[in-house]
Amino acid sequence: VTQQVVDLVALQKRTLRVLVVGQVVAAAALSAAVTVGAFVIQDILGQETPWGGISNATFTMGSAFMSQVLAQKMSRKGRRVGLQYGYSLAIIGGFIAGFAVNRSSLPLFILGLFFYGSGQASNLLSRYAAMDLAAPDQRSQAMSYILFGSTFGAVFGPVLIQPAQNFGIEVFGWSKYTGPWIASACFFSFALINVALRLRPDPLEVSGGLNSQQGVGVVTPKLGAALRTIKSIRNARVALASMVISQVTMVAVMTMTPVHLKLHGHE
């Protein structure tokens, strides 16, 4: 039993290292590309367009939708397969968005952003993967490591925007904002490889959580049923309202800040 405990502790430490590396890289990809999203909308629709926030809105909707898809896939196939699936879709979304930017195609750009949101969903779900093997009194600490790692990527990502722009323009002749999207897709490729090769064994499988709900006859509720349950519980309604208000505030600030800075010559 002691040896088993030691092995689990060692495996948890290794799992956290793998997830943190993925968080840093993926967070850099997300922050670099999403920062220029509003600029792309302005380039396509004009500087005075009232639709500058559509980029982050689409990205957020994609993240919300894919969170459901990836969570279900993880419950059946494990954390590694779910994260691989999410990062793969983010790579596809990044390349679609980059192609769309180069062609000034708004529909394609919106499509790419939606798929790109799966990268954010994967990063968020990584926090739960960090807790699979953690002791009950260490789960919050395990999640904090993932959050801490993502801050490095979030700070590092925007620094890459200018080099990516210059590289794309000088080497490939791309339009100004194409480079950051292609670079972000490449960063997600690294995150995908990191998870595919190093997140072994799967922490959810080791913890006994893989297919555990089906094994005891537990059925995941549909969205409508879940919303009705939330509606019937006061604290749940307050929690949901708080999350919605916080998300709206965050998206509004994130969208308009780069636009405001650009207008004042601080792009």
Where in the sequence are the language-model features?
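Juxtamembrane intracellular "pre-TM" segments in multi-pass secondary transporters
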Residues: 1-13, 200-241
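Helix-loop boundary and gating motifs at the non-cytosolic
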Residues: 6-62, 235-242, 250-260, 264
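Helix-loop junctions at membrane interfaces in 12-TM secondary transporters
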Residues: 13, 99-111
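Hydrophobic core of transmembrane alpha-helices in multi-pass small-molecule transporters
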Residues: 24, 106-121
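Helix-to-loop junctions at the C-terminal end of transmembrane segments
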Residues: 66-79, 165
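C-terminal ends and interior cores of transmembrane alpha-helices
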Residues: 88-103
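Glycine-rich segments within core transmembrane alpha-helices of 12-TM secondary carriers
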Residues: 141-161
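C-terminal membrane-cytosol helix-exit motif in multi-pass small-molecule transporters
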Residues: 157, 161-166, 185-210
